[in-house]
């Protein structure tokens, strides 16, 4: 919501799309044109939103794709529809942080290069990748634990996974974490190492700090390579400059 807040200050009219009512909470106090709630996960849905905006007003000056770097299906879909409709699109790519104290892995099977037998490993991943990572870590003889966020999809997926039911925690953070809950889980389960994603966001930074301070290993699942032929930026300042350069063309 930082981008939306800053763009409003610059005088832009903003429509925001979020996947759930919960995700809309940070935006509700902002003076937005509209908050669209529900996953825009198909070409038809994205096309419909863009065309509706054109029918009811002047349409969107630009679509800004702020989706998660591991949500690999949505960016190509947005890009395809925007190209078809001649809709300007800018993709925000989170900066990649320095990972000097972490091990970078391209895929979960790369964990096989490390001695994990009888080690307690905490999976701090998106729930969609939980079962795959669980299979590899368990297969290497690790004692596997996980933490997931308190939303219906995550709870359903972890309950249907093969993880031992006493080995996961459901977290319901009300704001950015200060790392104390994460440290408490590490102490409770006597964790030797954490697996998380190279997301480039607050969560990755948090795990880097927590693992460093507690002297445990951290494995980062490498971020998917960015999509070619999509106009992308990696900071708010560059976004503003790009929008201004488009508007004077």
Feature locations, PLM:
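Structural motif
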Residues: 61-62, 120, 192-193
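Internal active-site segments that recognize and position negatively charged phosphoryl groups
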Residues: 109-145
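N-terminal basic/disordered segments at the start of proteins
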Residues: 1-22
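Glycine-rich, highly charged phosphate/nucleotide-binding loops
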Residues: 31-53, 171-181
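N-terminal beta-loop-helix "entrance" segment that forms/cooperates
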Residues: 16-39, 107, 155-161
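Short, polar loop motifs at secondary-structure junctions
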Residues: 18-24, 92-96, 127-129, 148-154, ...
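Glycine/small-residue-rich loop that forms an oxyanion/phosphate-binding "nest" at active or ligand-binding sites
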Residues: 50, 62-110
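Histidine/lysine/aspartate-rich catalytic loop segments that bind and position anionic ligands
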Residues: 141-176
């Amino acid at each position: 919501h930082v981008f939306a807040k800053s763009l409003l200050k610059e005088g832009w009219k903003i429509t925001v799309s979020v996947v759930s009512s919960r995700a809309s909470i940070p935006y509700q106090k902002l003076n937005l044109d509209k908050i669209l709630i529900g996953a825009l996960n198909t070409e038809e849905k994205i096309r419909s939103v863009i065309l509706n905006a054109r029918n009811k007003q002047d349409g969107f000056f630009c679509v800004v794709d702020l989706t998660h770097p591991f949500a690999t299906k949505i960016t190509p879909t947005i890009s395809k529809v925007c190209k078809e409709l001649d809709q300007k699109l800018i993709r925000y790519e989170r900066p990649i942080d320095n990972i000097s104290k972490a091990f970078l892995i391209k895929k979960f099977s790369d964990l096989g290069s490390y001695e994990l037998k009888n080690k307690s490993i905490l999976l701090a991943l998106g729930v969609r990748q939980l079962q795959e990572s669980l299979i590899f870590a368990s297969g290497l003889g690790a004692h596997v634990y996980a933490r997931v966020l308190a939303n219906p999809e995550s709870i359903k997926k972890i309950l249907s996974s093969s993880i031992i039911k006493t080995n996961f925690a459901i977290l319901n953070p009300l704001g950015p974490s200060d790392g104390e809950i994460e440290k408490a889980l590490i102490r409770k389960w006597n964790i030797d190492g954490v697996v998380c994603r190279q997301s480039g966001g607050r969560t990755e930074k948090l795990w880097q700090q927590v693992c460093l301070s507690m002297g445990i290993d951290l494995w980062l699942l490498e971020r998917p390579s960015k999509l070619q032929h999509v106009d992308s930026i990696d900071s708010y300042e560059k976004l503003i400059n790009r929008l201004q350069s488009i508007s004077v063309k």
